[in-house]
């Protein structure tokens, strides 16, 4: 795989159902990548079956997250997609966001048109380009047009279509865990082992920066690497289970960074703040100093631990001796029917 991203802008493949009401982590990250308070975002709802309300929702969301301006552009056919009036808002956009819906419709309208080329040009000059659900799938060179759910990969489980090609050498699927799309993505990797299978959960984004993939959000990004796969995809019958042996599986939660070129995990988790690192270094220095002082006295740390254990044993012996010297009660108390003390045997049995 020689190149996985065609330009300097960040690419956001969002698995759908991104949080719009609470933390809005994924959308906030997109706005920041698009320029934060200077972000000029174009919303493209072509895939959606909803009316103008979908534009209003994202306009309000991105404005609340600090974007400078948000406009909606909705080409409904290829004629619209070649009309300069639909294309001009993309010319100075710092972010392009494609909504969910019917990805085959989105691909049929946008790919191979002036509008699609304008999106690619925006990305090449540094704009963040993102999409949720259908808008995520179209980012790749090859996209899943439709398919069936299920955990087992089967022959002819899904259909491919052409995408924008911003992510090359990979297939992106969405709503991944929530709609059980493991089988259909793995079947495509089995049939095209050179393609990396990337499945994105809901409220999660696979963020492509150069040859690195970063995970943001509540779920995980699942990656199927079939570069060493053994498969029967070339002769399996229709709907038959596919052989997929030797596939490397990566499940990446938030903060994970993956090298798409070498297909390995680069990092996971965030480094502590500089102040915490300084405190940890100071604590380690104190421990080293204490160890030297103990060694200088000729007494090992084990000595102090042994002395503490011996002191504990002496205390136990004294307590036992004090117990033996107590006078016995003249009338032992028994737990009878009228006693206020509980029958210990019954109480223990009742708690097992």
Regions found by a protein language model. Give the residues of each.
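C-terminal and late-domain segments of enzyme folds
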Residues: 1-37, 49-64, 144-145, 149-352
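General beta-strand structural signal in soluble alpha/beta enzymes
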Residues: 13, 71-73, 97-98, 129-132, ...
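Portal/gating segments that form or line small-molecule/metal binding sites
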Residues: 42, 48-93, 98, 105
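Charged helix-capping and loop-helix junction motifs
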Residues: 57, 111-116
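Catalytic nucleophile loop
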Residues: 98-100, 119-143
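Glycine/threonine-rich flexible loop motifs
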Residues: 103-113
